[in-house]
Curated annotation (Swiss-Prot):
<keyword id="KW-0808">Transferase</keyword>
<comment type="function">
    <text>Member of the two-component regulatory system RprX/RprY. May activate RprY by phosphorylation.</text>
</comment>
<keyword id="KW-1003">Cell membrane</keyword>
<feature type="domain" description="Histidine kinase">
    <location>
        <begin position="296"/>
        <end position="517"/>
    </location>
</feature>
<dbReference type="GO" id="GO:0000160">
    <property type="term" value="P:phosphorelay signal transduction system"/>
</dbReference>
<dbReference type="InterPro" id="IPR003661">
    <property type="entry name" value="HisK_dim/P_dom"/>
</dbReference>
<dbReference type="InterPro" id="IPR052545">
    <property type="entry name" value="Light-responsive_reg"/>
</dbReference>
<dbReference type="InterPro" id="IPR036097">
    <property type="entry name" value="HisK_dim/P_sf"/>
</dbReference>
<dbReference type="InterPro" id="IPR036890">
    <property type="entry name" value="HATPase_C_sf"/>
</dbReference>
<keyword id="KW-1133">Transmembrane helix</keyword>
<dbReference type="InterPro" id="IPR004358">
    <property type="entry name" value="Sig_transdc_His_kin-like_C"/>
</dbReference>
<dbReference type="GO" id="GO:0016020">
    <property type="term" value="C:membrane"/>
</dbReference>
<keyword id="KW-0067">ATP-binding</keyword>
<dbReference type="GO" id="GO:0005524">
    <property type="term" value="F:ATP binding"/>
</dbReference>
<feature type="transmembrane region" description="Helical">
    <location>
        <begin position="260"/>
        <end position="280"/>
    </location>
</feature>
<dbReference type="GO" id="GO:0005886">
    <property type="term" value="C:plasma membrane"/>
</dbReference>
<keyword id="KW-0547">Nucleotide-binding</keyword>
Length: 519
């Protein structure tokens, strides 16, 4: 699959996941906003009803105290008699209706007859005397009730005016029963669906706090609500109740918490998708690097095979057989190229180490200074071939480590070989090897004056198959396994390695290995 196709699919899927995540976040934000508005509306409705309840309570208390039986009864019962005869009970009640000036307007008698078994009363009205008939008496009763209603209305208006006048002079503590106020708050909050812990306080017209509940906590204006207790009072004399909900945020969050798992699942899918795309690109890059490796490996094998083939053909020449010196020379070439080919095969076999968790190491006590000196003596001829020089500063006073001699030797050799491969064509190679001690560690540095490494490539030099060059041209011999092998061996020895480099200046590799014994 082409890289451009992977990018297009990745962008489409990524945008789809991001859009889905954005919609979920927007939906949660809208739900939180809606729940807040719903909560605010419910609380304000409850507080408004509390205000009405408090006003009603005060009005009822005033009416019970001030209204008296001031009006006269126009309809009064004058007498009552009871007779029992032949199993019947007869009750007679006589009523007189008087006009406002006190004169007798009409009189009638109400008789009720009850039989003992059924207890069902029977009533009839008998006219005794007066100027009016029963219909006229009924009209008189209606007028009297109407007059009584008007009187009571005027009486209530008078009481209300006096109540408002006197109430404005009383303190809020005298006007409100705080225990009842708490009950009103609780019942109205429940009626409006707000079943949440609340704290409240009462503030008088001067802004002083005259009451607060025992566990009151002021959580700021966002979670607090205020409501005038007596809305008809003048603004200068108005008292308010302040209610705070300490668990409001948790209450709002709990109402939308069912969406959180869905959003988390989407985020997990997005992360998994990103990781999958990363793996796809990494595998594609690894494939390209393997192809590059095959090209380089083919070139590395082609040269010794061609040389051996040519030498084998020369041996068929009868003239070669007659010249012992020529025969010995050709045999030496075949032997050298065979060793070279075997060495390349061994390097390819190093690939299998990267598929194992840990290499098989033959650990023993080593003097790192002596080991490095031996490698330098062997490698000096190759450096001199390029008109270079190699120096050493073996300053480590405690160079003893517990390591695999063969693998550590290969590590030093590979790092020196890299210095030769990446030397500047126009300058002579200068290679320096240094050792020193740090607490509990042996430090080894190998520094050259080669072409250097770009910063963006520096962190990749230890990757398998990675080689610092342009394109797939075989400009430097090797398979791209050397530094990956070096890093793995150092890590298997519980050490660390890092690279420091500057383009066109040189590269420095620093190795830290644990000492066998601390001084």
């Amino acid at each position: 699959m082409k890289k451009s196709t992977i990018w297009i699919l990745g962008i489409i899927m990524g945008l789809s996941f991001l859009s889905l995540l954005y919609l979920q976040v927007s939906y949660i934000e809208e739900m939180v906003k809606m729940r807040k508005e719903q909560f605010n509306t419910s609380v304000r409705n409850a507080l408004f009803q509390v205000s009405k309840d408090v006003e009603y309570d005060e009005t009822q208390r005033w009416l019970l105290e001030d209204i008296t039986e001031a009006e006269r009864r126009a309809l009064a019962q004058s007498s009552s008699t009871t007779e029992q005869k032949n199993g019947l009970i007869q009750q007679s009640e006589r009523y007189r209706f008087k006009s406002p000036d006190g004169t007798l307007y009409s009189e009638f008698e109400l008789k009720m007859i009850t039989t003992e078994p059924s207890k069902v009363p029977k009533a009839m009205i008998s006219e005794r005397h007066g100027r009016n008939t029963i219909p006229q008496t009924s009209r008189s009763l209606t007028d009297a009730i109407k007059n009584r209603y008007m009187y009571q209305r005027f009486l209530l208006d008078d009481v209300a005016l006096r109540m408002i006048y006197k109430a404005s002079d009383k303190s809020i503590g005298e006007r409100v029963n705080f225990k009842k106020l708490d009950n009103y708050l609780k019942s109205n909050f429940i009626n409006n669906g707000v079943e949440l812990l609340y704290h409240f306080s009462v503030i008088d017209k001067d802004g002083r706090e005259v009451y607060r509940c025992s566990d009151y906590e002021d959580g700021g204006s966002e979670d607090s609500y205020t409501q005038p207790l007596f809305q008809n009072d003048p603004p200068a004399k108005m008292s308010i109740v302040k209610v705070h909900f300490p668990g409001k945020k948790d209450y709002i969050f709990d109402s939308v918490s069912f969406m959180i798992p869905s959003m988390i699942f989407t985020i997990v899918l997005l992360i998994t998708f990103i990781f999958t795309i990363y793996i796809v690109f990494r595998q594609k890059k690894l494939t390209e690097m393997k192809n590059d490796f095959i090209n380089n490996m083919t070139h590395e094998f082609k040269t010794p095979i061609s040389t051996i083939s040519l030498a084998a053909q020369m041996l068929k020449d009868p003239a070669v057989g007659k010249s012992p010196q020529m025969f010995q020379h050709i045999s030496g070439v075949i032997n050298d190229e065979t060793k070279r080919l075997r060495f390349q095969v061994e390097k390819v076999l190093q690939m299998s180490m990267f598929d194992r968790q840990k290499a098989t190491l033959k650990m023993k006590e080593l003097d790192a200074n002596e080991l490095i000196t031996g490698v330098i003596n062997t490698f000096a001829l190759k450096v001199e071939r390029y008109n270079g020089k190699i120096t050493s500063n073996l300053e480590a006073t405690n160079p003893v480590i517990f390591a695999d001699e063969m693998h550590i030797t290969n590590v030093i050799f590979n790092l020196m070989d890299n210095a030769v491969k990446y030397k500047k064509p126009e300058e002579d190679l200068v290679l320096n090897v240094r050792t020193w001690n740090e607490p509990g560690k042996l430090m080894i540095s190998i520094q050259d004056n080669g072409i250097g490494i770009k910063k963006e490539n520096l962190k990749k030099v230890f990757d398998k198959f990675y080689r610092v060059h342009t394109g797939n041209l075989h400009d430097v011999k090797g398979f791209g396994l050397g530094l990956a092998y070096v890093k793995k061996i150092i890590q298997d020895h519980k050490g660390t390695i890092r690279a420091e480099s500057e383009l066109n200046v040189g590269t420095k590799f620093i190795i830290a290995l644990p000492l066998l014994k601390n001084d």
